[in-house]
């Protein structure tokens, strides 16, 4: 509360395997209520149900639009990966994952449209691509352009010197060379 460099309180990263979205809704509301007893100034970031899936946001996290924040400073966080099951494991290649240039846009659009329809702020808290095929970069470029066009911020998943050199999604240069 006393630090001016805190952007938001993140309630939980990738809630999943809960009984229902209502359960996550109830937990999130309790957290919001508790935080607001001590801090009315800092934004609260709420991740979506089922791994914060942007693609399935309306299906699995729509009830979050009914959360109440007396400070009116809620924001929402979704995650997006471009592989076949949207897990970010990229177990198969670009072709085997049936990837195409607008796949990232198609995956994030439900979340972006939900934010707009409900007049909420939000961000993509995780996205990333493997370094195994340069075509993933083209998908990422289109995705990032779409986020920029819609004033949505995002965070790449694997960056920083603590990632192993062989981490397939890391973007940190290795031995002075960009990936």
What do these predicted ranges mean?
Residues 48-50, 157-164:
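Short, solvent-exposed turn/loop segments enriched in Gly/Ser/Thr/Pro and often Arg
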Residues 133, 164-165:
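Short secondary-structure boundary/hinge segments and terminal tails
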């Amino acid at each position: 509360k006393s630090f001016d460099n805190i952007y938001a309180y993140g309630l939980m990263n990738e809630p999943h395997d809960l009984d229902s979205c209502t359960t996550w809704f109830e937990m999130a509301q309790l957290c919001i209520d508790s935080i607001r007893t001590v801090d009315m100034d800092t934004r609260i970031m709420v991740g979506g149900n089922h791994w914060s899936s942007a693609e399935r946001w309306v299906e699995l996290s729509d009830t979050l639009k009914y959360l109440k924040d007396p400070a009116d400073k809620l924001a929402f966080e979704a995650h997006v990966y471009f592989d076949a099951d949207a897990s970010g494991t990229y177990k198969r290649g670009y072709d085997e994952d049936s990837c195409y240039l607008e796949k990232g846009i198609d995956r994030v659009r439900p979340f972006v449209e939900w934010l707009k329809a409900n007049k909420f702020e939000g961000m993509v808290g995780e996205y990333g691509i493997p370094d195994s095929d340069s075509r993933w970069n083209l998908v990422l470029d289109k995705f990032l352009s779409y986020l920029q066009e819609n004033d949505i911020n995002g965070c790449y998943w694997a960056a920083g010197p603590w990632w192993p050199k062989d981490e397939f999604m890391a973007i940190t240069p290795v031995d002075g060379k960009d990936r």
